[in-house]
């Protein structure tokens, strides 16, 4: 009977992380690609910001110049190349600088969302006030400091100008009256401008 031979089980080879000259693990290519894409998206968000909001972003001068140039370019291919350059500039930022930008952008989005919701509320309230006298009673109950006489006058004149097809002067003034009665501040107006929702100019 021939002697039994012991089979050797071949163990799978574990991938070895790349190390740099100092012995630290290098990030994988997929990780680098993902980080580059995230920075590109962040750069695009900066380019898309309203002008006033962009001024409040904590950017180094080199990034600010690159972003403003991207905003200026209208040619599709030229803008695409400039956005790539914005991404390259962003890769030179420190982790703290990138984190500060993300925080500022998140705050800006929150302000815009709140401002847009508030403007929509003002518009809905204006529609209700013009449609029903009962709506004014309810509005005054919720906002007792509002000027009752001014509100009634604006509503009456806004209805009349709509019937006569006149320019919406009182319609717009009613918007401002509702906004003031609701306690809108200057910061609300600024946020509304940033959001691009200049609703009180509509017809």
Swiss-Prot record:
Residues 1-31, 182-203 are annotated as: Disordered. Its main location: cytoplasm. The keyword Nucleotide-binding does not apply. It is found in: Cytoplasm. Keywords: Cytoplasm, Ribosome biogenesis, RNA-binding, rRNA-binding. InterPro entries: DarP (IPR006839), DarP_sf (IPR023153). One of its GO terms (molecular function) is ribosome binding. One of its GO terms (cellular component) is cytosol. Residues 186-203 have a biased composition (Acidic residues). It comes from the Bacteria. Pfam families: DarP. GO terms for biological process: assembly of large subunit precursor of preribosome. Member of a network of 50S ribosomal subunit biogenesis factors which assembles along the 30S-50S interface, preventing incorrect 23S rRNA structures from forming. Promotes peptidyl transferase center (PTC) maturation. PANTHER family: UPF0307 PROTEIN YJGA. Belongs to the DarP family. This is Dual-action ribosomal maturation protein DarP.
């Amino acid at each position: 009977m021939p002697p039994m031979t012991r089979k050797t089980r071949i163990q799978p080879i574990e991938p070895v992380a790349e190390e740099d000259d100092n012995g630290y693990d290098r990030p994988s290519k997929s990780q680098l690609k993902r980080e580059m894409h995230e920075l590109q998206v962040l750069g695009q968000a900066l380019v898309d910001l309203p002008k006033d909001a962009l001024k409040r972003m904590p950017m180094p001068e080199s990034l600010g110049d690159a972003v403003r140039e991207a905003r200026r370019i209208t040619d599709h291919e030229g803008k695409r190349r400039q956005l790539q350059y914005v991404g390259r500039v962003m890769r030179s930022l420190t982790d703290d600088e990138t984190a500060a930008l993300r925080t500022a952008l998140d705050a800006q989005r929150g302000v815009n969302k709140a401002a847009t919701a508030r403007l929509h509320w003002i518009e809905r309230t204006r529609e209700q006030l013009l449609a029903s006298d009962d709506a004014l009673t309810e509005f005054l109950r919720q906002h007792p400091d509002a000027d009752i006489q001014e509100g009634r006058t604006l509503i009456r004149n806004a209805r009349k100008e709509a019937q006569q097809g006149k320019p919406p002067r009182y319609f717009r003034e009613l918007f401002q009256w509702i906004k003031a009665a609701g306690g809108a501040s200057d910061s609300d107006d600024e946020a509304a401008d940033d959001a691009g929702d200049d609703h009180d100019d509509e017809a």
